[in-house]
Amino acid sequence: QGVBBBZGLFSAR
């Protein structure tokens, strides 16, 4: 799932 990361980019956690 692509969630908004801390840096402001979409990363799959």
UniProtKB/Swiss-Prot annotation:
Entry's Gene Ontology BP terms: adaptive immune response; blood coagulation; innate immune response
Modification after translation, per record: Conversion of fibrinogen to fibrin is triggered by thrombin, which cleaves fibrinopeptides A and B from alpha and beta chains, and thus exposes the N-terminal polymerization sites responsible for the formation of the soft clot.
Source domain of life: Eukaryota
Cell compartments where the protein resides: Secreted
Keyword S-adenosyl-L-methionine: no
Comment block on domains: A long coiled coil structure formed by 3 polypeptide chains connects the central nodule to the C-terminal domains (distal nodules). The long C-terminal ends of the alpha chains fold back, contributing a fourth strand to the coiled coil structure.
Protein name (database record): Fibrinogen beta chain
Organism encoding this protein: Hylobates lar
Lineage: Eukaryota, Metazoa, Chordata, Craniata, Vertebrata
